[in-house]
Amino acid sequence: MNYLNILLYLTIFILFSMILCNLYMKNKAKIVSLENTQEGFTGSDSEVKSIENNKNLASVGNIQSIGKKYADLPLKEYCIKASYNSACSGNYVSKDMIRHVLSRGCRFLDFEVFYIKHKNNFMPVVAKSTDPKFVLFDTDNHIPLEEAFTSIIGNAFSGTSPNKNDPLFLHLRIKTKKTECYNEVSKLIDSILKPKLMEGEVNEETKVSEMLNKIVIVIDKTVHRDYKDFAKCKAQDVNCYDISNYTHLESGSQVLNKLTLSQVENQPSNPIMIKDDNVSTTAEASKLVLPISKNTQNPKIQKMILSYGIQIVAYKYDEQDKELEKCEDFFNDNKGGIVPLASAITYFERIDTEQKK
């Protein structure tokens, strides 16, 4: 009897081990170590083309740059078309995907930045990761941050973008505590983006008209709230580039609140009201919502704006779902990638009324 029990336990153990091994190999095929990922975007062409050929997305023919007379409100009074992990087309990251989201009229681009060893040197790169320790990538490749910035400066203010005169917000989630990375990121901003860089800080009173045709750098302070301490240049290092000299806004701050989709949906509804002038609202700060990384569904823009007054709702452009289509319809119907919050509330209130009939 004892031998039968031992045999049974042994069989169960072997089966369980095989299941775990199979799950591990599946994940390993998808998630690879930072130092072993391919540089560049070999294999991404078909992914980007598939996304570009999606006939369900509204034409961007109506989208245009915001007119100066409509841009005189503070930043918090505008909804901005935003993409999440803007270089990601699914399994790959590429400069072609950056060009695509810009061609759709997105003016808030989001990137995860890592610092990895390349040959004998370290360099900042763009990839996608859900690893809390930032040791593994979800994408099968990475691209140098330099390549991403070059794609941005070459496409954001050219005919590629239907709203090329709008300000462009670059949201950098820098996932390292290495001082050298912040120095390298700052150096790339200085050498590539500087001609279009906004001068001075941006706060809750800064008007969009003051940022037209400019790049605004946004650093995610929630990754490392003390990032300024270890990113600070030493007095004797004259060749160091301090990230604080290139940062206009911080997400996770009082000026730009940063929330995950799950955080928002766990809160009670808190609608923003349109004031009696029919132009401004009761919004006190700009709010940014990022989708859940491991969730395939995009946020519901109607709910985000009407129930919570979220101005910047970032979308996964590699997830071609109905919610992305609704986001595209909204910005296309309102003829811009930057739309007054009051207009957005009115637009979705009308849709909400029609849905209840």
What are these regions (language model features)?
Residues 2-108, 114-191, 203-357:
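Long, acidic (Asp/Glu-rich), low-complexity accessory segments flanking structured domains
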Residues 195-198:
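Charged/polar low-complexity intrinsically disordered regions
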